[in-house]
């Protein structure tokens, strides 16, 4: 679990659920650590403020390269909002992990702010096709390539597509709470253990 000043937004209840399901959560700092902790079987890159620390994140070439390599190799990874931004090509012109397309930029205002219902368009790490999850977006930054693995709908009826998702990845601006759909936590841990659920 990425935990430092750049990555600090997590629902503690969600982390507690992962622990209750048997996960050992090992913190690391994308700002300070040169490599991932030994033996990790999955990544959780939460929200936060990577844009405020983009220069320092960019300087950590070794960890950025390792994270890109393990994501490409299929290590299960959840990356919400700031964590998603970190996986893209860049934030404000500063090189990031580069595992996903897109360059993040400051819109100067809240973008797609509020609660949404996200519907999985295909089976993925956390959801099966057609499953719906309550989520929310809260960010000033955006990218021209936010992904299209989920359909998002606000209570007002406004719709768009969001997030990248494969059998080993969820990465997008929307945040979720594992207790909204606990099977997502079970699926994430099963993927980390290389089990079928």
Annotate each PLM feature.
Residues 30-33, 66-67, 87, 125, ...:
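Generic recognition of flexible, low-complexity loop/linker segments
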Residues 43, 80, 97, 138, ...:
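Hydrophobic, well-ordered secondary-structure elements that form the walls
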Residues 5-7, 32-33, 48-51, 84-85, ...:
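Short, glycine-/Ser/Thr-/acidic-enriched flexible segments
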Residues 50-124:
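Cysteine-nucleophile active-site neighborhood
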Residues 105-197:
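Amide-donor transfer/coupling interface in amidating biosynthetic enzymes
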Residues 1-2, 6-60, 65-70:
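Phosphate-binding active sites in nucleotide-utilizing proteins
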Residues 24-26, 41-42, 75-76, 97-98, ...:
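Structural motif
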């Amino acid at each position: 679990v990425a935990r430092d000043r750049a990555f600090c937004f997590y629902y503690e209840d969600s982390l507690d659920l992962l622990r209750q399901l048997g996960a050992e959560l090992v913190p690391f700092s994308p700002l300070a650590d040169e490599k991932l902790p030994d033996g990790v079987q999955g990544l959780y890159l939460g929200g936060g403020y990577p844009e405020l620390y983009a220069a320092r994140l960019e300087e950590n070439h070794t960890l950025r390269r390792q994270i890109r390599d393990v994501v490409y190799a299929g290590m299960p990874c959840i990356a919400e909002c700031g964590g998603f931004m970190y996986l893209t090509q860049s934030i404000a012109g500063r090189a990031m992990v580069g595992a996903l397309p897109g360059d993040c930029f400051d819109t100067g205002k809240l973008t797609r702010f509020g609660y949404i219902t996200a519907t999985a368009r295909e089976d993925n790490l956390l959801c099966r096709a057609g499953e719906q999850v309550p989520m929310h977006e809260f960010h000033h930054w955006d990218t021209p390539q936010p992904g299209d693995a989920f359909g998002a709908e606000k209570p007002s009826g406004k719709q768009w597509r969001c997030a990248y998702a494969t059998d080993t990845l969820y990465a997008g601006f929307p945040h979720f709470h594992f207790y909204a759909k606990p099977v997502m936590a079970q699926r994430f841990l099963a993927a980390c253990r290389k089990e079928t659920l």
